[in-house]
Amino acid sequence: METSRQNPTTSRAKAKSTEATVRLPREALTPEDHLEILKQLYLARYFDVRLIKEKRRGRLTGTLYSSHNQEGILVGTLFGLRPDDWISPIHRDMPAFFMKDLRAGWDNPDRLGMSVEEVCAQVWCRSGSPGRARDNWSHIGSRSKHIIHSTSMLAGTIPVAAGVVLADRLNGGDAVVLTYNGEGSTAQGVFHEAINFAAVHKLPVITIVENNMWAYGTPVELECPTEDVARRADGYGIPGLIADGQDVFDVYDKVMTAIEYARAGNGPSIVECKTFRAYGHGDHDDDRAAKYRPNDEVEEGRSRDPIAVCKRYLVEKGYLSKAEAEQYHAENKGAQQATDEDFPPDVVAYLKKGVDYAIKSPTPPAEEGGMWVFAE
């Protein structure tokens, strides 16, 4: 049976909210903030590009879960957080681990986010990595950095996130937590249980739904009976907002609206970010994805690169000249086509520092294989 599918990054990226906003949160951003947002988009994209190249050169093992074309969600959600706020990333949010609290300074050792060296060591399964070389991807966390441990059971960390901010409230705090989920995970029973609990107790849990239209190989119309996943919020009596995931500033506006609502004691929100997955579920699925996704859907999704959308907006606002916008060309290029010259030199140097650290770090000795299995 064939169904008519619309790309959410264009025809369905409508702004919907139960809360009217007179002044957009982005209006409080400085010109420097706008340029920093673009730079962070480049950083998230370069992380993806560099790792895919390393994997295809045989210098990296394990599975990669690309965030290519979804960087607007990462940057737009993280940029407005306070250092003491919490995040709960998933497998497609690997840059979030080192991009949390990046506004405090990329090389600031005191910022509440992991270092790029730590995250790269995790990817290369090196000694001293957050996962102690037991895993090469996102199954890591840090209480001191306010990052909730990621798991393969999608939506499974939402109850944990609710518990974290409940404890914070009981201790007199007003931190919020962002939980990241794919649209497929909203059909999980634990998603309902956690959101219902957060709504009843008015907990500051902001659920970011990265709707890239596919839960592995299952299309969104077989996952959710409504056109907009955010409508699930209606059943809990909480706001359901919809953002254009390709527009980092629209994501920022919607998430900041939800953050302000939560921090004021009003409770949780769901923010659906309509986006497009550039590749397969993981790099093991790239070839298969080329067969199960319609070509026109792929072409339309790739036509709205979040870096290009951001650059156009910055030029329109006068924060970026046309010459500056044309200086780098990472947008609309696949990982194999993009080169270091397509990115700002400081972005390349920053990630190279992490990659070099990981490659030079030792692998753990065999005798550590039985350690950290049980609490001692």
Where are the language model's segments positioned?
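Residues that form or immediately flank small-molecule/cofactor binding pockets and catalytic motifs
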Residues: 46, 92, 245
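Short acidic, gly/pro-rich beta-turn/loop elements at beta-sheet edges
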Residues: 97-99, 217, 281, 368
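Conserved acidic/glycine
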Residues: 1-73, 79, 281, 285-376
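Short acidic/polar alpha-helix capping motifs at helix-coil junctions
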Residues: 15-18, 38, 127-130, 196, ...
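Glycine-rich ThDP/TPP pyrophosphate-binding loop and its adjacent helix/strand module
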Residues: 147-356, 360
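A general secondary-structure junction signal
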Residues: 91, 273-275, 373
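Cofactor-binding active-site loop characterized by glycine-rich and histidine/acidic residues
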Residues: 49-52, 57-201, 219-225, 230-237
